[in-house]
């Protein structure tokens, strides 16, 4: 998946990421850009507009939770399937989340990282992160196979 050099680059960069801010924005953007994903979050209250979603405290809190899990995965890049096994089971068996949504969230996360980190988020770093988010999405979808 990733070379040792790529792992060093993504983990080094990840230390600069403000997980609470990036997580909140990434989940919020997912819900706005792909509104059908909102069906999993109806209990979060008002999701009636982009502003409502982006300012929703429950969306922000869950976005941080999602990125906390992603951060854990960043510590275990060689065992993403093992790291995300329980979350894969939860999302497959109990929540019935379409695994395609994991790919969508990964792509939104890359957009948010680029927005927050500007020129520091180079095309090469983006390519490396695309590998990471694809690996995480694959690990989360593992239970579906």
From Swiss-Prot:
Coiled-coil zones: none
Domain Globin: 1-145
Stated family: Belongs to the globin family.
GO MF term set: haptoglobin binding; heme binding; hemoglobin alpha binding; metal ion binding; organic acid binding; oxygen binding; oxygen carrier activity; peroxidase activity
GO biological process: hydrogen peroxide catabolic process
InterPro entries: Globin, Globin-like_sf, Globin/Proto, Hemoglobin_b, Hemoglobin_oxygen_transport
Tissue expression summary: Red blood cells.
Function: Involved in oxygen transport from the lung to the various peripheral tissues.
UniProtKB keywords: Heme, Iron, Metal-binding, Oxygen transport, Transport
CC terms in the record's Gene Ontology section: blood microparticle; haptoglobin-hemoglobin complex; hemoglobin complex
The organism's place on the tree of life at top rank: Eukaryota
Assembly description: Heterotetramer of two alpha chains and two beta chains.
Protein's name in the database: Hemoglobin subunit beta-A
Residues annotated to bind heme b: 62, 91
């Amino acid at each position: 998946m990733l070379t040792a050099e790529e792992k060093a680059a993504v983990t080094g960069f990840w230390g600069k990421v403000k997980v609470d801010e990036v997580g909140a924005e990434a989940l919020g953007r997912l819900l706005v850009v792909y509104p059908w994903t909102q069906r999993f979050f109806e209990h979060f209250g008002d999701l009636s507009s982009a502003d409502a979603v982006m300012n929703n405290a429950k969306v922000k809190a869950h976005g941080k939770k999602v990125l906390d899990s992603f951060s854990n995965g960043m510590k275990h890049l060689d065992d993403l399937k093992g790291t995300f096994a329980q979350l894969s089971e939860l999302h497959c068996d109990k929540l019935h989340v379409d695994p395609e949504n994991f790919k969508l969230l990964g792509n939104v996360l890359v957009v948010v990282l680029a927005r927050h980190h500007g020129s520091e988020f180079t095309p090469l770093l983006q390519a490396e992160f695309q590998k990471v988010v694809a690996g995480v999405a694959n690990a989360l979808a593992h239970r579906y196979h």
